Amino acid sequence: MRRFLFATILDICTMLDRHRQKKTLAPSLAVLDSQSVKAPHASDRGIDAHKKIVGRKRHVAVDSDGRLLLVNMTPANVADSTGAQMILDAMYRKWPSVKHFFADGAYERKSLMDKATYLGFVVEVVKRTPGQTGFQPVAKRWVVERTFG
């Protein structure tokens, strides 16, 4: 019950903030990303082999200004594209106005693209410029990185 109360409060705050910024109440675009976090004592955890982290993974969707729309927690060993499919299902029900998603290269998977097409979404994979090293925010995805900040 509390989880739904928190989600409802978050949705209302998101819409009020969008209204204050003179935007439509419901977003039409979202940015997807995930972040692995250490949680050695969590009962439902996994190992993110790429980042060598034992814990959980946050899969998030934010609007064009970085407002949190959805969060999904999974064990860290769940692939980004699998977590994104769960986000797409929830977005279809909760924010039907969102039709376009930006994501990084980890989301360029046939299963995710098929799911997005089936639900009527467009997932645009935004890659870094060739030869780029280290962390540099990518123009269309920086808002989600700032949200993790």
Regions found by a protein language model. Give the residues of each.
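Short alpha-helical elements
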Residues: 1-149
